């Protein structure tokens, strides 16, 4: 399945919520009619079935983290094998992806841009180049910008925007050095309340 390369706003309108796919601090403007389906004359959403609600939630989270369908299913299988709450395990696995950690540290303005930084070998993990976006970051790993990439204007711009956002408590960042430490996996209370991971568990449990 190919990665979606179309308009980012269209995906947010499809899911009826801001997926934070576009750069910037502010949420998507209300004039964008996010409650309406995509299209010039996007209709108001009708009532969804139980399955439809579960599917939409899965699609929302998958698109938010920029993960393909097969990858997402594999993350769920891994989460189900880990002791504890499957839904919370799933979110922690997604949060531990290198592209997401780069985004959380503010080196990329979006997860898509962060994924590109990783793929273009601009990111170091514990001093070594890692160019796999799905690389699993562990507690106390140090993630930094490669020396020759530090002059990139987009990284500087992303860090400036990140300064205005609420900083994740599970990550420590030195913007001057362009490096950060992944202190721990986030707790469920650290993450967005707008995600209902229980619906995803119900969907895959059928």
Swiss-Prot record:
Picking any one GO biological process from the record gives: translation
Which positions fall inside the S4 RNA-binding domain?
96-156
GO CC annotation terms, alphabetical: small ribosomal subunit
The UniProt entry, under SUPFAM superfamilies, shows: Alpha-L RNA-binding motif
**Which top-rank group of organisms is this from?**
Bacteria
Q: Which GO terms describe its molecular function?
A: rRNA binding; structural constituent of ribosome
Task: Enumerate the UniProt keywords alphabetically.
Answer: Ribonucleoprotein, Ribosomal protein, RNA-binding, rRNA-binding
InterPro entries named in the record: Ribosomal_uS4 (IPR022801), Ribosomal_uS4_bac-type (IPR005709), Ribosomal_uS4_CS (IPR018079), Ribosomal_uS4_N (IPR001912), S4_RNA-bd (IPR002942), S4_RNA-bd_sf (IPR036986)
Task: Show the Pfam families listed in the entry.
Answer: Ribosomal_S4, S4
Q: Which family does it belong to?
A: Belongs to the universal ribosomal protein uS4 family.
NCBIfam families, per the entry? PRK05327.1, rpsD_bact
Subunit structure and binding partners: Part of the 30S ribosomal subunit. Contacts protein S5. The interaction surface between S4 and S5 is involved in control of translational fidelity.
Q: What is this protein called?
A: Small ribosomal subunit protein uS4
Provide the species name: Aliivibrio salmonicida (strain LFI1238)
């Amino acid at each position: 399945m190919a990665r979606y390369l179309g308009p980012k706003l269209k995906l947010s309108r499809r899911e009826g919520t801001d997926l934070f796919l576009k750069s910037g601090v502010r949420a998507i403007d209300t004039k964008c009619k996010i409650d309406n389906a995509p299209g010039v004359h996007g209709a108001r959403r009708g009532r969804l079935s139980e399955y439809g609600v579960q599917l939409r939630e899965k699609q929302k989270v998958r698109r938010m983290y920029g993960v393909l369908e097969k990858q997402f299913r594999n993350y769920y299988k891994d989460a189900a094998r880990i002791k504890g709450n499957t839904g919370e395990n799933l979110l922690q696995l997604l949060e531990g992806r290198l592209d997401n950690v780069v985004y959380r540290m503010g080196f990329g303005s979006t997860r898509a841009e962060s994924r590109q930084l990783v793929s273009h070998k601009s990111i170091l993990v514990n001093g070594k180049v890692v160019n796999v976006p799905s690389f699993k970051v562990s507690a106390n790993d140090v993630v930094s910008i490669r020396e020759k990439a530090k002059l990139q204007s987009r990284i500087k711009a992303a860090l400036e925007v990140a300064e205005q956002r609420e900083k994740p408590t599970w990550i420590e960042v030195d913007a001057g050095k362009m490096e950060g430490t992944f202190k721990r996996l986030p707790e469920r209370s650290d993450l967005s309340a707008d995600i209902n991971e229980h619906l995803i568990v119900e969907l895959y449990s059928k």
